[in-house]
Amino acid sequence: MRPSGTAGAALLALLAALCPASRALEEKKVCQGTSNKLTQLGTFEDHFLSLQRMFNNCEVVLGNLEITYVQRNYDLSFLKTIQEVAGYVLIALNTVERIPLENLQIIRGNMYYENSYALAVLSNYDANKTGLKELPMRNLQEILHGAVRFSNNPALCNVESIQWRDIVSSEFLSNMSMDFQNHLGSCQKCDPSCPNGSCWGAGEENCQKLTKIICAQQCSGRCRGKSPSDCCHNQCAAGCTGPRESDCLVCRKFRDEATCKDTCPPLMLYNPTTYQMDVNPEGKYSFGATCVKKCPRNYVVTDHGSCVRACGADSYEMEEDGVRKCKKCEGPCRKVCNGIGIGEFKDTLSINATNIKHFKNCTSISGDLHILPVAFRGDSFTHTPPLDPQELDILKTVKEITGFLLIQAWPENRTDLHAFENLEIIRGRTKQHGQFSLAVVSLNITSLGLRSLKEISDGDVIISGNKNLCYANTINWKKLFGTSSQKTKIISNRGENSCKATGQVCHALCSPEGCWGPEPRDCVSCQNVSRGRECVDKCNVLEGEPREFVENSECIQCHPECLPQVMNITCTGRGPDNCIQCAHYIDGPHCVKTCPAGVMGENNTLVWKYADAGHVCHLCHPNCTYGCTGPGLEGCARNGPKIPSIATGMVGALLLLLVVALGIGLFMRRRHIVRKRTLRRLLQERELVEPLTPSGEAPNQALLRILKETEFKKIKVLGSGAFGTVYKGLWIPEGEKVKIPVAIKELREATSPKANKEILDEAYVMASVDNPHVCRLLGICLTSTVQLITQLMPFGCLLDYVREHKDNIGSQYLLNWCVQIAKGMNYLEDRRLVHRDLAARNVLVKTPQHVKITDFGLAKLLGAEEKEYHAEGGKVPIKWMALESILHRIYTHQSDVWSYGVTVWELMTFGSKPYDGIPASEISSILEKGERLPQPPICTIDVYMIMVKCWMIDADSRPKFRELIIEFSKMARDPQRYLVIQGDERMHLPSPTDSNFYRALMDEEDMDDVVDADEYLIPQQGFFSSPSTSRTPLLSSLSATSNNSTVACIDRNGLQSCPIKEDSFLQRYSSDPTGALTEDSIDDTFLPVPEYINQSVPKRPAGSVQNPVYHNQPLNPAPSRDPHYQDPHSTAVGNPEYLNTVQPTCVNSTFDSPAHWAQKGSHQISLDNPDYQQDFFPKEAKPNGIFKGSTAENAEYLRVAPQSSEFIGA
């Protein structure tokens, strides 16, 4: 039988209606997104591969879409699949001609770029003004939040024709920033069919699709045409295919299967029959912008119906019916802390002034608690102050001790153990002397006061030698014990007769089971009834406030909705349904404060009730939409409040949780698949030896140059010490006619294996870094005595340099140095390297305009999963260290920020000593009290506030090095505004440049072929005519990547040249080496491509401070600091800060090598080093009490000593 035409049409309509739903239910591939902004990840190739891995086949970006540093001819076709971005879209610093975001429909703008923009397209061009030409985002129809910015895109076509008011919300139009500078005549015009000439590119397919400004007045949001019947549902975003909420292209708020909704279905509904809230079988949890029936794994459920990663501070996590839920805590939430002798208290004898703060809010102690006499006396050996008796109140939250409680000292003015009044159970899993779980010995208390103690699970009790203690013999201890074998030992306390004579007996309301003190609240149990913890004579059943009922000899308060009765009972039990009479209204069997109004009921209907004259709640008429004041339609309220929508902030937070969850899930799944395939392949090849455990950490591809001893020449001894000797010398690469001034560090013949290991570790760190502002290792010679070869630095360390030239240093130099040091430290942070010893003495001066960070003797490389380094001992620079490093030996990149702040202070005070006159042993205490280094006289408050931020106690509150670069770079552009130096504009520093300088420095005559090490390792094109014949040459990629631009330019002499690195000898004497070249610097004829990450190239007016450019100035004939080079034990700095020495804190070095600092500044861990103290206290003592070794009064570097021991046995 053939179906009729009507039935066939109905079937087709049904199928058409189901198609959008099926499409909406499809699972789209999501990706995490990035938050790098303008940071480049390695080389251009590495950066592009990272971009491709992140967004390949991605349809929904949960974070931000950042397309940066993409070079010409790279294929970006993988971006075509992206349809939705939750954060912002950033397209910047690209030279590729086309970025195909053809299917991008919506940008939600949950996160902004520069606090304003959801779409930013910036500086997409190269030196030839060519670059991004096509941006075909033809399906982009809505930006929910945020404005749009276009700037410096000289080759971009057609975008200026877009009607942004159709895409961007009207509230953000005022923040739009449109700077279109397209002067190219090669752009194709929009297709004539495009509305109002608006298009994203040539061709009819690139015409802008209008879904807002063309809508009829009846439409409240988007539309698909000009007719009133073409309006989209108000829950739709970016357009629609029909009028229903299931026809949306994208949901504006939440997606519940195929339907867009304002909120997810609630978990609970009001039941008008039972007058209770019942579980909604259709209820769902909100997870990001999606409604889900079940929260993803590792998420917990809140009472509000949301999937969250962790419970709030006032709730705890528990499992109920197979679901992990957050439940409100009754009182303080449970917090488990380690006891004495465990974890962070492993070597601690007693609770004291320094560790009691760690027990704040603890409810359970995992281990034991000791309170010994040393706690209240203090310990001068460990610099522990006496414990303030008021701080014992911190222990009032403790309810459980899994080990034992030992108290041998207590404040004289306290009559009981008040700090343990809430202690409920002592489990006795560990015991003092293997016997006692509770020991109270030799105290001045009159009562125990352990009024909450209900159980001592194991172990005996000893209460002895308390001359004023009463009440202890009244306790029925057997009732508290968990086993029959437990015993008590209560001796040598105050006699029972003496206690009775002074009235120190249990209260009359206490039962014969005894008491913990004289008050009614101290009773073990009550004679009559109890109210809370206190025994009372009777309950407030017939009179008194609040009214109560009796349950198990306990007074229980009636519900607040029960009306108190006169000489009659008010309630018969707990809850609002056991009241004799209601105080306000009656809703079924329950007493309520107000009748239900707008409560969600069955079938998603709202329940409204009104109260009659008898205060009984009745249902409103079904047609009353906004409540009522009486029965029938005439009682309906005309206007009512609208249901509040979910806050935008909650949506953003849930989306962020979704990003994190999906990102982790995708990462774990991908890693599992790769590992499984690898194991399968190896098993098939029958070559599997052991399971593979790839770490995922990037390989260290640094190059280590091995030199022959014949390739370098030692000229002069710089100094010697316990580890070896440092020489000035020349490196003459084999087969090349160049001479490179170097420093050579040679170990002694009898050097220990430990010293060899330390110098090789230092070489590993130096070889792993390559930055203009970080010292580099030139090579290593593996002779019988290991030799390190590093670059020779002409001007020594920055500390001595600022001291010697303090009358000639202007604000420009000081701020430039701050920028360069921050750049070097930011590079080390990117390489996961913690320096641990940043100071002005460890910064070397290559030229007055160029400084480098050195001394990696204490530096540590963090692993892929490490965020901090825990030191085990050794020498440390106390006055430069962060507080957490001093107290806990924790070193992070943020502890380096603290040291950076001290280094800046040294520069701004022209080499003053930090905390001068204060012993190093007192530094931690004055820092904890809030004292910091004073404001230098030349610094404005702007500069000083940056230093103060570096010295915040909370490490996360300190600025990042990348932020410090931005701040000091801004100041370096206007130096006299931030530093006030008299005669600043006339100050300049000598800067010799020719080979005469090296000739004088090296005492050599034949220095015509001298070449700086940086120029040799990364030479300019055509610099050397003959190739190197060394057997260990640098890879060609080093020189190939030294310049990112291939565009030719003409220098001032008319010779062909290329853009130069900021530490190049061609730019050595620029007035501001920290900044980029400007267009004015080469007569506006050429703008070089930035060589470094985030190098800005804006054109700005010249500052008022001008630094001279030096050319061939004569060398100073007799440098004043030359004797320091000859004498490593010079006493140039008076009143030395370091122990057992008169050596200076910094000797003028001439090369960027940690080896030289180890010799001159003594930063290696050796016995003859004044700057680093191995142990502040000696480990042994002679029988006469005199310590072996030297003592310290003002050590800059010290090590935490073990605590003293004091213990009195029971």
Swiss-Prot record:
Residues 712-979 form the Protein kinase domain. The record marks 1016 as: Important for interaction with PIK3C2B. Hypothalamus. It is an enzyme of class 2 (transferase). The modification Phosphoserine is found at residues 229, 695, 991, 995, 1026, 1039, 1042, 1064, 1070-1071, 1081, 1166. The chain crosses the membrane at residues 646-668. One of its GO terms (molecular function) is epidermal growth factor binding. Residues 688-704 are annotated as: Important for dimerization, phosphorylation and activation. Endocytosis and inhibition of the activated EGFR by phosphatases like PTPRJ and PTPRK constitute immediate regulatory mechanisms. Upon EGF-binding phosphorylates EPS15 that regulates EGFR endocytosis and activity. Moreover, inducible feedback inhibitors including LRIG1, SOCS4, SOCS5 and ERRFI1 constitute alternative regulatory mechanisms for the EGFR signaling. It catalyses: L-tyrosyl-[protein] + ATP = O-phospho-L-tyrosyl-[protein] + ADP + H(+). PANTHER family: EPIDERMAL GROWTH FACTOR RECEPTOR (PTHR24416:SF91), TYROSINE-PROTEIN KINASE RECEPTOR (PTHR24416). Binding of the ligand triggers homo- and/or heterodimerization of the receptor triggering its autophosphorylation. Heterodimer with ERBB2. Forms a complex with CCDC88A/GIV (via SH2-like regions) and GNAI3 which leads to enhanced EGFR signaling and triggering of cell migration; binding to CCDC88A requires autophosphorylation of the EGFR C-terminal region, and ligand stimulation is required for recruitment of GNAI3 to the complex. Interacts with ERRFI1; inhibits dimerization of the kinase domain and autophosphorylation. Part of a complex with ERBB2 and either PIK3C2A or PIK3C2B. This is Epidermal growth factor receptor. It comes from Macaca mulatta (Rhesus macaque). The lineage of its organism: Eukaryota, Metazoa, Chordata, Craniata, Vertebrata.
